Amino acid sequence: MQITNSLHTAILVTDLQRSEHFYGTVLGLAKIDRSLKYPGAWYQVGNYQIHLIVAPSSPTDNQNEKWGRNPHVAFAVADLEIAKQELLNHNYPIQASASGRPAVFTQDPDGNIIELSQQ
């Protein structure tokens, strides 16, 4: 077997409207059409996609001291300071990467961990 590309990450959410605000407005991802019947939303990030899937009983882990060591989605950002300010403006907590590199972690409204890294 040869894996040739990464296609998408599926993220469980409990409130689609709230999550669409986070991924579409706060993170600025481009929403794309989807033809599936179950509730959700798809976002395009370059050649990659983020699939929000509604799962009303999705478990969350709010222990932010270990965000970087938990499963997470990482996005590259052009300016980390602007990204941090945007998250804070929308009242999302941030945690600097313990590695010392230019990156922060936050959580979406359902507790899914998001890394923003300046490349």
Predicted feature residues:
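N-terminal beta-strand motif that seeds the catalytic metal site of vicinal oxygen chelate
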Residues: M1-R18, P71-F75
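Vicinal oxygen chelate
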Residues: Q2, K84, L88-Q119
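Core segments of cupin and vicinal oxygen chelate
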Residues: I11-I50
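Short acidic/glycine-enriched loop/turn segments that link adjacent beta-strands
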Residues: K37-P39, R69, S99-P102
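A short, acidic/glycine-rich surface segment
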Residues: S57-Q63
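Mid-chain, well-packed structural core segment of small domains
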Residues: K66-L87
